[in-house]
From Swiss-Prot:
Region (Disordered): 1-34, 100-122, 286-323
Protein task: Transcriptional regulator which can act as an activator or a repressor.
PTM sites of type N-acetylalanine: 2
One Pfam family here: PurA
Keywords: Acetylation, Activator, DNA-binding, Nucleus, Repressor, Transcription, Transcription regulation
UniProt name for this protein: Transcriptional regulator protein Pur-beta-A
Ranges of biased composition (kind: Acidic residues): 313-323
Keyword Transcription annotated: yes
Length: 323
């Protein structure tokens, strides 16, 4: 176990006897399974795997030099997507060359304060939307260097018991800033926790958001997500569950945008059949097009395509007859 500055709910103000009892209730209901501490530059990061009645989730806490904390909460499914996104950011960061002083000054803004809010230009951006939570990932640069800013916003709509002031449509947010030099170490630590504790994945598990921990409870296991890369696009296939049942989320990701669709389990067979049918039809179309192109070629073109002497087998036969 790490020290008392872990990413758990310790250290927060109780806000009176009622708040203290609620805090103790949360501590009793939520179990901490594992924690990992990372020291990157002058910051400490804690990755805590927790479990409550709805399942497992990961809390990420950033502790600054002055002791200030920022926390993010990820379901195991979202954590797996973060792991994949971190790989993309690591690859993009590795391809970036050194910045000129003019570029750094432009990226840092006029004040040059060097804080997370200073940069105006993102080198690479991605975002995720899951139930009532949104996650924004921006690779930025200021006078202190390059870093990945991760911001989480929560829509505390009707029925969300997230504390005082949780009116309809109210959003609260937390932000952490991860130095780019620590991206690989952070990704590897997150991946290890997912590998060790991510077997009970659920789309909204443990987060207390709308639709979390519903109809997917009957499934003790769901297929693992995967991704494929085609040209400049990347497609993610993630299986999740909510109160409506099991679904497949297919996400199309390009450097400039991300789009996704959700397919319920009962439609998977129809989707798969449609893909297979179109794949076979396109193969037949391509074969017919190749045949037509071959027929359009004249005899001279076909002979040239066979190489010098026309057919190699006939040439060898003639040599044998001469002997």
């Amino acid at each position: 176990m790490a020290d008392g500055d872990s990413g758990s709910e310790r250290g927060g103000s109780s806000g009176g006897p009622g708040g203290f009892s609620q805090h103790m209730s949360r501590e009793q209901e939520t179990q901490e399974l594992a924690t990992k501490r990372l020291d990157i530059q002058n910051k400490r990061f804690y990755l805590d795997v927790k479990q409550n009645a709805k399942g497992r989730f990961i809390k990420i806490a950033e502790v600054g030099a002055g002791g200030s904390k920022s926390r993010l909460t990820l379901s195991m499914g979202v954590a797996a997507e973060f792991r994949d996104y971190l790989g993309d950011f690591i690859e993009h960061y590795a391809q970036l060359g050194p910045s000129s002083p003019e570029q750094i000054a432009q990226a840092s803004g006029e004040d040059g304060a060097g804080g997370p809010g200073g940069p105006r230009r993102a080198l690479k951006s991605e975002f995720l939307v899951r139930e009532n939570r949104k996650y924004y990932l921006d690779l930025k640069e200021n006078q202190r260097g390059r870093f990945l800013r991760i911001r989480q916003t929560i829509n505390r709509g009707p029925g969300f018991s997230g504390g005082a002031g949780g009116g309809a449509g109210l959003q609260s947010g937390q932000t952490i800033a991860l130095p780019a030099q620590g991206l690989i170490e952070f990704r590897d630590a997150l991946a290890k926790l997912i590998d060790d504790y991510g077997g009970e994945d659920d789309e909204g598990v443990g987060l207390g958001g709308a639709g979390g921990g519903g109809g997917g409870g009957m499934y003790g296991e769901l297929p693992e997500g995967t991704s494929i890369t085609v040209d400049s696009k990347r497609f993610f296939f993630d299986v999740g569950s909510n109160k409506y049942g099991v679904f497949l989320r297919v996400s199309e990701v390009k450097p400039s945008y991300r789009n996704s669709i959700t397919v319920p389990l009962k439609a998977w067979g129809k989707f798969g059949g449609a893909f297979c049918r179109y794949s076979e039809e396109m193969k037949e179309i391509q074969e017919r097009q190749r045949d037509k192109m071959y027929e359009r070629r004249g005899p001279g073109d076909r002979e040239r395509s066979l190489g010098p002497g026309g057919g190699g087998d006939d040439s060898e036969t003639e040599d044998v007859d001469d002997d």
